[in-house]
Amino acid sequence: MKVVEVKHPLVKHKLGLMRSADINTKDFRALATEVGSLLTYEAATDLETELVEIDGWCGKVEVERIKGKKVTVVPILRAGLGMMDGVLEHIPSARISVVGIYRDEETLEPVPYFTKLANDVEERLAIIVDPMLATGGSMIATIDLLKKSGCKHIKVLVLVAAPEGINALQAAHPDIELFTASIDSHLNQHGYIVPGLGDAGDKIFGTK
């Protein structure tokens, strides 16, 4: 499995701001979008382009365009919605597929409750967004759903990832690509990433 920890100074700076215990909802939400945008930029570096001829201001000119790669962005509800706009800034024509999965606080197992995928998801590159890759359970379940629907090309964007989640994802889906702003230290006894971001969903939505 390809794992990319994006070490750009802007990514590290913005993620550092997000780690503050007293960050407000407005700033956390904005930074989640900004870091999601920067991760998208990194994840899109291998998209193929082709030359097309257009009418320029001084006549015909050849320009590069993305070559026939259709995209669907897949936010995992609910926290993934906080990163979705960062992807759409660069790929505004992407279709939106939604997967609702929550983690049982006692068993830490993923529990699916809603799925609405793009009609032609099997023809698209799926970019899954979720702030945290902790145990990996929710992400693995989401990828399972996408593959069962025929999706073959999948990339994952997360703000922070735990080694435990990366290992689980590698074991379950070695063919996907993972892009993260940080590989953090470990999971604590409650299944939270350390140092992590706290509860990203609560911080994005202003709930507790």
Swiss-Prot record:
Annotated GO biological process: UMP salvage; uracil salvage
Positions bound to 5-phospho-alpha-D-ribose 1-diphosphate: 78, 103, 130-138, 199
Keyword Lipid metabolism: no
Keywords: Allosteric enzyme, Glycosyltransferase, GTP-binding, Magnesium, Nucleotide-binding, Transferase
Needed co-factor(s): Mg(2+)
Molecular function (Gene Ontology), one example: GTP binding
Regulation: Allosterically activated by GTP.
Broad enzyme group: transferase
Positions of uracil binding: 193, 198-200
Alphabetical list of NCBIfam families matching this protein: PRK00129.1 (NF001097), upp (TIGR01091)
InterPro entries in the cross-refs: PRibTrfase_dom (IPR000836), PRTase-like (IPR029057), Upp_B (IPR034332), UPRTase/APRTase (IPR050054), Ura_phspho_trans (IPR005765)
Function comment: Catalyzes the conversion of uracil and 5-phospho-alpha-D-ribose 1-diphosphate (PRPP) to UMP and diphosphate.
Enzyme Commission identifier(s): 2.4.2.9
Cofactor remark from the record: Binds 1 Mg(2+) ion per subunit. The magnesium is bound as Mg-PRPP.
Key word Lyase present: no
Pathway in which the depicted protein is active: Pyrimidine metabolism; UMP biosynthesis via salvage pathway; UMP from uracil: step 1/1
Family statement drawn from the similarity comment of this UniProt entry: Belongs to the UPRTase family.
Protein name per UniProt: Uracil phosphoribosyltransferase
Known catalytic reactions: UMP + diphosphate = 5-phospho-alpha-D-ribose 1-diphosphate + uracil
Domain of life: Bacteria
Pfam families, per database record: UPRTase (PF14681)
